């Protein structure tokens, strides 16, 4: 088995707000399953599809996709803040291959990734830099969005590059399912918010702390059914997980940005990272789900899922 997959939700609230004990225990059990799966597979290289929450990518230049040749963590919510262990030559070769498939992407020699990208690695390995990892940014919060079909094709191109590799490759997709946290939208942002969305790099510790506290406060209210944000949508979440499990990746194409906003929240677009990861695995062959966990968790403001998948023996 040369390719495998781990897709999982992330939440900056994991270490800031606890759900009920039974829910927290079920999440920890899911993380244990994910750790065992990944450590048993023991990848040589990891391709990490992840979003950003205006910590590394901003409206001054917002690509739909970006492959990092070098990268560091932003350290938001006390997440990893060091240099990632990026195999630079492989990342360069991957980017050129994807472009040769007719997909226009960006590259970065100085990528900054936030909690949304690094949290799976923190959970699985502790040290994000412990394994060679190619960071792949997929725009998941900033309109305008490319069609989901384009995300699928991008993922397939990445997978095609690794299909015949002599390396064991793990595709990670990081993103919450239905959720609508208090992330400003450019269409309704005030002047200060527009400035942050356009170029909010290097915030002061006080500004970052205030921004993060707003999210934590919203989560507390949301768990008490007092927050003015969209509720989670378990039905939508389970429907999306069914598509992931089916292997019919063309079915991802039916998802549209407007519908996702309306029924699953403005940050449900983070499932684009799942689409890319599952499409990458499917490009390597038919797959089957090895493990699936799902709970709607208000304390994390997220439809929260963990899945692993392996290629079928044919």
Swiss-Prot record:
GO terms for biological process: 3-phenylpropionate catabolic process. One of its GO terms (molecular function) is 3-carboxyethylcatechol 2,3-dioxygenase activity. Pathway: Aromatic compound metabolism; 3-phenylpropanoate degradation. Keywords: Aromatic hydrocarbons catabolism, Dioxygenase, Iron, Oxidoreductase. The active site is at residues 115, 179. It is an enzyme of class 1 (oxidoreductase). It holds the Pfam family LigB. It catalyses: 3-(2,3-dihydroxyphenyl)propanoate + O2 = (2Z,4E)-2-hydroxy-6-oxonona-2,4-dienedioate + H(+); (2E)-3-(2,3-dihydroxyphenyl)prop-2-enoate + O2 = (2Z,4E,7E)-2-hydroxy-6-oxonona-2,4,7-trienedioate + H(+). Its cofactor is Fe(2+). Gene3D superfamilies: LigB-like (3.40.830.10). InterPro entries: DHPP/DHXA_dioxygenase, Xdiol_dOase_suB. Its EC number is 1.13.11.16. Belongs to the LigB/MhpB extradiol dioxygenase family. Homotetramer. HAMAP family: MhpB. Catalyzes the non-heme iron(II)-dependent oxidative cleavage of 2,3-dihydroxyphenylpropionic acid and 2,3-dihydroxicinnamic acid into 2-hydroxy-6-ketononadienedioate and 2-hydroxy-6-ketononatrienedioate, respectively. This is 2,3-dihydroxyphenylpropionate/2,3-dihydroxicinnamic acid 1,2-dioxygenase. The gene is mhpB.
């Amino acid at each position: 088995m040369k390719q495998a997959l781990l897709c999982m939700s992330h939440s900056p609230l994991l270490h800031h707000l606890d759900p009920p004990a039974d829910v927290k225990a079920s999440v920890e059990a899911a993380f244990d399953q994910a750790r065992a799966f990944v450590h048993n597979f023991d990848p040589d290289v990891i391709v990490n599809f992840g979003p950003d929450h205006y910590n590394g990518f901003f409206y001054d230049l917002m690509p739909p996709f970006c492959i990092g040749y070098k990268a560091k963590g932003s350290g938001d919510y006390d997440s990893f803040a060091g240099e990632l262990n990026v195999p630079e030559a492989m990342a360069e070769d991957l980017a050129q291959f994807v472009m040769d498939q007719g997909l226009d992407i960006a590259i970065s020699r100085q990528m900054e990734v936030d909690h949304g990208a690094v949290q799976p690695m923190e959970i699985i390995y502790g040290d994000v830099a412990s394994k060679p990892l190619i960071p792949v940014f997929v725009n998941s919060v900033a309109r305008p969005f490319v069609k989901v079909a384009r995300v699928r094709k991008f993922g397939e191109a990445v997978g095609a590059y690794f299909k015949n590799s002599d390396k064991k490759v793990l595709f990670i997709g990081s993103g919450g399912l239905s959720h609508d946290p208090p992330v400003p939208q450019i269409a309704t942002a005030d002047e200060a918010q527009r400035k942050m969305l356009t170029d909010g790099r290097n915030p002061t510790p006080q500004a970052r702390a205030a921004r993060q506290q707003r999210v934590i406060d919203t989560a507390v209210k949301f768990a008490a059914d007092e927050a003015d944000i969209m509720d989670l949508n378990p039905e939508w979440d389970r429907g999306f997980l069914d598509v992931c499990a089916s292997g019919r990746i063309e079915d991802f194409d039916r998802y549209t940005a407007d519908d996702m906003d309306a029924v699953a929240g403005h940050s449900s677009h983070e499932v684009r990272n799942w689409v890319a990861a599952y499409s990458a695995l499917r490009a390597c062959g038919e797959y089957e789900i090895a493990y699936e966990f799902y709970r709607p968790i208000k304390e994390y403001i997220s439809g929260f899922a963990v899945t692993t998948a392996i290629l079928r023996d044919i």
